[in-house]
């Protein structure tokens, strides 16, 4: 199964967390690790100047997916289904979830409550 990585795991990797490094290295060794362009935006927006080189190296190792019409449509469907009972989900999380659904990918995230639409979601480390 392919993997879609969320911002939280990438940030942990950049901070040297062994679990994040291991899960990404395993994913990359097994094939492509995917990410939403929303994740790239979040990572770049929070990047400090001294983190630029390692951040850009990490970002080049991922397969990126745009927020296109298919993602927007699916994100809208997910929002209508889940926002009435889970108001804390934001548009970025809906777009990331929609990308994972469309790719049929396993989502790697630490923010489990942002993604209630994945019944079997668990922390990756």
Model-derived segments and spans:
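A general structural signal for well-ordered alpha-helical segments in protein cores
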Residues: 20-21, 40, 52-55, 72-75, ...
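Short active-site oxyanion
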Residues: 30-32, 61-63, 101-106
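Alpha-helix capping/helix-boundary segments
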Residues: 9-10, 39, 71, 95-96, ...
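Acidic, PIN/NYN-like endoribonuclease modules and their adjacent C-terminal/linker elements
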Residues: 97-125
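Short, well-structured N-terminal submotif of metal-dependent ribonuclease cores
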Residues: 1-35, 44-57, 125
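Generic structural signal for small/hydrophobic residues in well-ordered secondary structure
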Residues: 6-7, 43, 75, 100, ...
